[in-house]
Amino acid sequence: MKNQICLVLAFSASLFLSHQSVAKEKDSAFVPFYFSTETLGSTIGLAGVAKGVGQPQAALFGMGLYSEKDSYVGFLSAFNYALSSNLLFSTQMYQARFNDNPYYLGDQGSNGSSTEDKTITNGDEENYKLEFKFLLPWGNVCEHGLLGAFQPIRDVSFASPVESGVSSIIFTPFYSSRELDIYNDKKEEATGFSLTFDWDNRDSVRNTTRGSHTSFDLTTGAESLQSEDLWLKWEFQNSQYYSLGPLGDWFDQQVLAFDFYTADTPTWNQCDGTVCSRPPEQEQVRLGGLYRLRGYTAGRYHGRSAIHYSAEYRVLPDWQPLDDIPLINYYDLPWWQWVAFVEVGRVADNYDLKTLHEDMKWNVGGAVRFQVEGIVVRAEMAKGADEGTFRVMINQPF
């Protein structure tokens, strides 16, 4: 398990909290934790969340950890502060130091690279984001106003964003940097912004049975605000969910979930001498981690473009023993879910559909997911051709 998982866990928390309802769950929680991995060694940390801070739909989240290798991660965030009846503000701040950490640099992250071909070095990482989310007056927001964006159960009878779901335009200025010792402390920096159209037409964020979720994202940036070497990246993602109903006395619910993702960097080959309009590696199109090619390390593959497919079979078993287990039954655990999934995808240095569908990487896996105090916790194992992972995290992958 790579140390970057801790960062992505925090981002997963932000994705989930952005859809929280004003609910009956606990207003705050703080959890100390300990784990040990090959890259970090023995590690201790503390994570906490507070809901309804200042406004009923708002939330604060923070996490910090420190390892025996003197590596550390710090993450702070605030979500869903209403600046007006249709404008929400969120922010995320992340800093980390990783010592003796594996990185897949340059061609080490290409589709044809070997898992054993990696660079071990020390690295400092930073990432800061401001998010301004404008809720379009369509669908659920038109009918229910601001609270329509936070309803836990929605009617998704229509296949148009004007009539159904929650549609938004999101403007996100950002700054990120990575400084590796192997590069003699030269920083790889990116300053820019992304513009996203998002249509969330799922009947439930936590346990989706019907509907869809679609987003299109444009990101542009450069090394600094004064730089003329602007790069441009676009990403498209679409998820679809189909209910199969119950299965006798075995399963109360069956769902087929599919996800499609593709991305490209059109400025990749716009070069002036040795300088090309390309994002630094931490901002490139990436596969591997918590959401795509989950059998591989976070950011294992990166480059100009990518395509990725996921399919999941999700069931809620009729057998529910969790309420009878001491200590565990202290928490609100309304359901648990069994999942089988398969994924294929690849990166490439050109956006060519034929190339992107050749020599694709794959993994298969299984997961058990729980809703705990309103938060979806997932434990999953995935295995690819040359790598495998086991992770415990929060939030549905899509």
Segments and roles (model prediction):
Residues 30, 58-62, 87-93, 167-171, ...:
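Transmembrane beta-strands of outer-membrane beta-barrel proteins
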Residues 21-92, 99-103, 118, 166-172, ...:
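Outer-membrane beta-barrel initiation region
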Residues 94, 100-257, 348:
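Transmembrane beta-strand segments of outer-membrane beta-barrel domains in Gram-negative
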